[in-house]
Amino acid sequence: MVAAGGAVELLRVLPHRGRGRRELPGMTAVRLEGYRLRAAAADPARDLAAVAALGGRLVCPGDREWPSQLDDLGDARPVALWVRGRADLRLWALRSVAVVGARACTPYGAHMAATLGAGLAERGWVVVSGAAFGVDGAAHRGVLAVGGATAAVLACGVDVPYPRGHAELIGRVAQQGLVIAELPPGGHPTRARFVLRNRVIAALTRGTVVVEAEYRSGSLVTARQAQRLGRFVMGVPGPATSGLSAGVHELLRGEGVLVTEASEVAELIGEIGDLAPDRRGPVLPRDRLDPIAAKVLDALPYHGLTSTRELARGAGTSADETLGRLYELHSLGFVEREGDGWRLTRPSPRDGAVRRGGS
């Protein structure tokens, strides 16, 4: 309605029962009457006073603090946002990432959400979520634990702690970060409002990470909305047998990017140079051998004794070079001597350094 006629025009025609359908094409009488009842109950001065008492404010399009990326929603852009907290909404949104997921998450999901939240916060990112039970709450707590920046986007008023069990958490977020809502103070959540809330999370952030989600999940709604808006979409994989990871895996089969830690998220959505560290396994004693010693070790079979001459032929080195390397390998515990022959040390070192394979 606002997109069709503008906020001022809407307020002009709503109070008059004989008007509205003509000025607002496509509006049914029943729907228009519903909007009239809601408009009659509105008290802007009361709402502004209520949010001010919480140390908050109303941020509108065109304000200095308005996040311009919300304009990507087009006609679905929020008319305004109620904000509670001291931080600047626009500046925080410029470097923000959403972490969302299942309410009834597993311990694994809660651990991953908290770890991601903490890791992203330590890298200077603002973690945005919905303050729900499960993954949302774990992500917020992970950020708060390291003194980072987090924002909760609610499907109710900024003064309504929902869910009730997260009243303390939402209060901590308001003190350390931001609590954001489309509904005015006192507004209560409904099923439809959660869906509307999800689009704000998707548009506000540079990317969305999904940690555990079933096939029919509000988190996937957020991810798909983010995808349509050209934002990055990521997912944390889980067990193939877990129904709570089925939706994430479906996302990863499409356009989603698999991530397992904060550095991978930052590499995808961050600036040039925000690279995740190279993955390497543990450095084993075998890795420290020089190339010739490694060749001699590779030439030793799993079982039985082998002469120095046979090993030299297998390694492609001289007999003297081979013998010198065998003594080196013996001092390191890789091989043992028996008469004129050499064999791999048994049992193998517990670190798995001895060569695997052989003839």
Where in this protein do the model-derived segments appear?
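Glycine-biased, small-residue-rich flexible motifs in mid-sequence functional cores and linkers
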Residues: L54-S359
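N-terminal positively charged helical leader segments and presequences
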Residues: M1-V79
